[in-house]
Amino acid sequence: MDDIYKAAVEQLTEEQKNEFKAAFDIFVLGAEDGCISTKELGKVMRMLGQNPTPEELQEMIDEVDEDGSGTVDFDEFLVMMVRCMKDDSKGKSEEELSDLFRMFDKNADGYIDLDELKIMLQATGETITEDDIEELMKDGDKNNDGRIDYDEFLEFMKGVE
C-alpha cells in the first residue's frame, strides 16, 4: 500500500474519521473479524458519497487486500477513502479553476491581461493597491509576455490556498 495515502489518512479530521468509521461499522456488525467483505465495500463507499465503478472498486480492493482474504479492515478502508477523496478533488478543482479563469478572462481571448486582473481583484472588495496587482501579474506571467495564459494561471493557483 502507498505510504503517501497512509500519511494522508493522518491528515483526516476527527469528524471525517468518525463519519467513515460509522459507515464502516454498519457493515461490520455481523462480522466476527471486524472486516467488511469486498462486495459490501461498494455500498459503504456510495453511502459516503463516493461512486467508484466496479473496475475502480476491484482495483482498490486488489491494492489493499494484501492477504487475499476478500475482506478489508478499517485501516485499509481509510486508505481507500483518502484515495477516492483525492481523485474527486482533483477533477473538481481543475473544473473550478477553469471556470475561474473564464471569469477573469473578460474578453475570452484565452489570456488574462493586467486590466482584467485589476477588474476581478477590485470586484472582490478587498483593498488592493496598483503595486499589489502588478506584483500578482508578474508572479503569474511566467513567460513575461504581459498576460497570463491558462497554464500560467493553473501554475499560479497551485500556490494559492
Swiss-Prot record:
CDD domains membership: EFh
Consequence recorded when altering A8V: In CMH13; increases calcium sensitivity of the myofilaments
Binding site for Ca(2+) 1: D65, D67, S69, T71, E76
Binding site for Ca(2+) 3: D141, N143, D145, R147, E152
Residue stretches making up the EF-hand domain: 16-51, 52-87, 92-127, 128-161
SMART domains xrefs: EFh (SM00054)
Phosphoserine modifications at: S98
GO biological process: cardiac muscle contraction; diaphragm contraction; muscle filament sliding; regulation of ATP-dependent activity; regulation of muscle contraction; regulation of muscle filament sliding speed; response to metal ion; skeletal muscle contraction
The UniProt record lists the keyword Membrane: no
Note, other: Cardiac muscle Tn-C can bind 3 calcium ions per molecule. Domain I does not bind calcium.
Protein name (record): Troponin C, slow skeletal and cardiac muscles
Biological source species: Homo sapiens
